[in-house]
Curated annotation (Swiss-Prot):
This is Sulfite reductase [NADPH] hemoprotein beta-component. Component of the sulfite reductase complex that catalyzes the 6-electron reduction of sulfite to sulfide. This is one of several activities required for the biosynthesis of L-cysteine from sulfate. Alpha(8)-beta(8). The alpha component is a flavoprotein, the beta component is a hemoprotein. GO terms for cellular component: sulfite reductase complex (NADPH). It comes from the Bacteria. Binds 1 siroheme per subunit. The lineage of its organism: Bacteria, Pseudomonadati, Pseudomonadota, Gammaproteobacteria, Enterobacterales. Its cofactor is siroheme; [4Fe-4S] cluster. Its EC number is 1.8.1.2. Belongs to the nitrite and sulfite reductase 4Fe-4S domain family. It catalyses: hydrogen sulfide + 3 NADP(+) + 3 H2O = sulfite + 3 NADPH + 4 H(+). One of its GO terms (molecular function) is NADP binding. It comes from Escherichia coli O157:H7.
Amino acid sequence: MSEKHPGPLVVEGKLTDAERMKLESNYLRGTIAEDLNDGLTGGFKGDNFLLIRFHGMYQQDDRDIRAERAEQKLEPRHAMLLRCRLPGGVITTKQWQAIDKFAGENTIYGSIRLTNRQTFQFHGILKKNVKPVHQMLHSVGLDALATANDMNRNVLCTSNPYESQLHAEAYEWAKKISEHLLPRTRAYAEIWLDQEKVATTDEEPILGQTYLPRKFKTTVVIPPQNDIDLHANDMNFVAIAENGKLVGFNLLVGGGLSIEHGNKKTYARTASEFGYLPLEHTLAVAEAVVTTQRDWGNRTDRKNAKTKYTLERVGVETFKAEVERRAGIKFEPIRPYEFTGRGDRIGWVKGIDDNWHLTLFIENGRILDYPGRPLKTGLLEIAKIHKGDFRITANQNLIIAGVPESEKAKIEKIAKESGLMNAVTPQRENSMACVSFPTCPLAMAEAERFLPSFIDNIDNLMAKHGVSDEHIVMRVTGCPNGCGRAMLAEVGLVGKAPGRYNLHLGGNRIGTRIPRMYKENITEPEILASLDELIGRWAKEREAGEGFGDFTVRAGIIRPVLDPARDLWD
């Protein structure tokens, strides 16, 4: 698919300003430490505004009150988002208690936000609390290093509670890959943890002095579940097991969903199969993929800098051969694998080790005490008595993992009393949104605040057409950067302007096909009118077991995207 347009291995030209910033930052230090002490502004200035992203933070402001503050001649109410590094989403109950306390006492919104990259975020950290949050994380063995900007981000791992042996092995690899690809600079420890400056020269043997051209995302996935949505990621290790034991991985490279409205040089892309590798080559191959992208990725245009664009420019076979050369291996042919779904199994599931796992549906991943539903307090109470761990899923849900039979009733009682086990429809369980307003500076339309009532309306349509026990993978993202992974949904809404979305159709349930734009810049009533008609047709005309996305393609409602680099915008 990608050998049609082989281009130069390295793009020559004027480097972006981000490249200058990284080069001049002294390995990500900048003047962040000095800026912390500037009480005249609640934000970070100049390069530091972007450099803090390498330390796991984004500077934001409350957009609901931005205009009001401007009228009062006040600067925006700056506050930081902090994203924890949590490979595979596994967090101990001691760690949970610490983050619960910090969220309640030191953030504007008081919430913990589970993300679809298997970690948690704090929103609304004022500048005075920035250093304390890093120190709190460090005190319980966590950090926020490399969870944003041009590095390998939080490594995902299938949250499969049943296959406990396989999950344990895959999770260990997710941690190893994460550690191996971390930056080596001591800037994080010096700035946030007050560790002494050591008189050695910083080196970044893998990432290099200017780090990666763009963000880089990695997964470890255990078929048949594609809960981590591998095709949204740059580098994916698909677990291959023999007799229940992990023996190696299929490698898929070059997925990614971010686009720009109207810019046909941007596209969502599914990852390409490179081949199979035995376990012992995992870290060498991971490093080789990252360093190839480091050296060949486009540093002259950030909108064309991700791995997916590098693959399309140089060709898949050329990129693959370079990875083989650097890793000193030859890929074996891809081993058979298949995906059957991506949703979480909500409720109790018994593992093969006789322990139980309770998956709790958390709408939009937002953990807060709501009227009559004290979710945050309930989880804190469970954390105080639970001997196992918690696992954040890539669907923004939470698993109480490793519950002995004797503890089940106690934990279920707390969960039910806190509203953590309220019954929801299959449709709601399979819907997701990014944060968007009021905190995200890129948001063009509502997402998290829009989704609950939107799904009420979809539930009504599903009931009207007699398919309430079915679901459609439905996602809303507030802008085309695509954090809500709408570009792998059966029905994807991509924010265009306040109250307006592009409606994409034709993805599939297992997340292996990019949906195509069906209608542009439409309102919620227009979206619902379209879906009313289409859900009605699906209910009447579908074949046995046929998902909504597959139906829209077979019925000729939408043309499938076959080669997104070339036909996404047709």
